[in-house]
Amino acid sequence: MIETSQTIPELVSWAKDREFSLNLPTERLVFLLAIAIYNNERLDGEMLEADLVDIFRHTMNAFEQSTDAIATRANNAINELVNNVVNRFSSEFTEGLAIYRLTPLGVGVSDYYIRQREFSALRLSVQLSIVADEIQRASDSAEEGVENNESEHFWRRNVFAPLKYSVAEIFDSIDLSQRIMDENQQSIKDEIAELLTKDWQAAISSCERLLDETSGNLRELQDTLNAAGDKLQAQLLRIQDCVIGRDDLYFIDQLITDLQSKLDRIISWGQQAIDLWIGYDRHVHKFIRTAIDMDKNRVFSQRLRNSIHHYFDHPWFLWTAQAERLVDLRDEEMVLREDDALGELPEELQYESLSDLHDQIVEHMQGLLIAYRENNRPIDLSLVLKEQLENYPLSRHFDVARIIVDQAVRLGMANDDLSGIYPDWQAINKRGAEVQAHVIDKY
């Protein structure tokens, strides 16, 4: 634990001394949120009691409650919030009119329910951009501190402070937003379950929309995290390299470790959430398909009866091809046709087993890659894959790429793998396939 953090006994004593408690019924929570929204629109951040009474009146209208004795009820509600989420100030200068301001606890609670509900790829991109700038400046300062042998004060001000009070807080905000998305996923699951239990036929389109929207949002956010994650980890490693062996800067090393763990946890849970949602998506589709299979005869017969019943309102024609085949369908002992197909298949349609393809590629790649080894030339897998995939149809690209990589890694390894730096993604075909691999330069 870094030295600026508080221990559990200290936090317990601090909360106990201030008598913190949270017991907000729905009506009081709505009242607090309304106060927070109104407070955000004011320049001075101060509110009068008349303002709070008006806000209370609006919230009661939303609950369709009586407005009788509204002033008394509003005063009771205000008194319940005072000293917990609202502070009251009064003096002789205010002539008996009290001034109200939200407490830090009130700001925190309302901020969670208002601003944290908005989680989008744009917001995440902005947050990650701010983090990248802060880490970049901190890493530059760290290298400057090493070169100039700066004092501990320099490291605390220019390296520790930005990481602790900017980067770490944004990571916590992203983590909190992910937890809110977990709640949203659960609410969507409940909504889908309710739709399917009522009328699954009418609910299919709604379920598809909810599933697709959630899958798209999760994938978009995870792509944004993945795009920035490697660069952020690389910058953190730069700072960590600067403090290695410096016992006086242990607090920075511990903070870097915490930030790396947070970033790994955020990215890992984002991918895990996608995998879990994909599993749920498949489960729902399987349920729908099963329901359709069990109900298809009744649905078809019902539609057929309706179409015949309304034939004169909306006449229709049934077009058939080879009508005698339709008559044959009534024969319960019909024998399947076993006519042999004669002639030769075009070359494009001829079957080639995967084992034959594997042997051909292995033989070719061994001859190609051994030349690299004999001449001690590095193997750029992305370039080799790109050149070789051009010789094969798209349907074989996956198997060909797998075989090439398998043969290449048997010859040697990449020194960059030991540095902890992630390689860049490189395109290997025209359909958007990419590979992430260091150059093999050690045999």
UniProtKB/Swiss-Prot annotation:
SUPFAM superfamilies: MukF C-terminal domain-like, Winged helix' DNA-binding domain. It is found in: Cytoplasm, Nucleoid. Keywords: Calcium, Cell cycle, Cell division, Chromosome partition, Cytoplasm, DNA condensation. It comes from the Bacteria. GO terms for biological process: cell division; chromosome condensation; chromosome segregation; DNA replication. Residues 211-239 are annotated as: Leucine-zipper. Interacts, and probably forms a ternary complex, with MukE and MukB via its C-terminal region. The complex formation is stimulated by calcium or magnesium. It is required for an interaction between MukE and MukB. Involved in chromosome condensation, segregation and cell cycle progression. May participate in facilitating chromosome segregation by condensation DNA from both sides of a centrally located replisome during cell division. Not required for mini-F plasmid partitioning. Probably acts via its interaction with MukB and MukE. Overexpression results in anucleate cells. It has a calcium binding activity. This is Chromosome partition protein MukF. It comes from Haemophilus aegyptius.
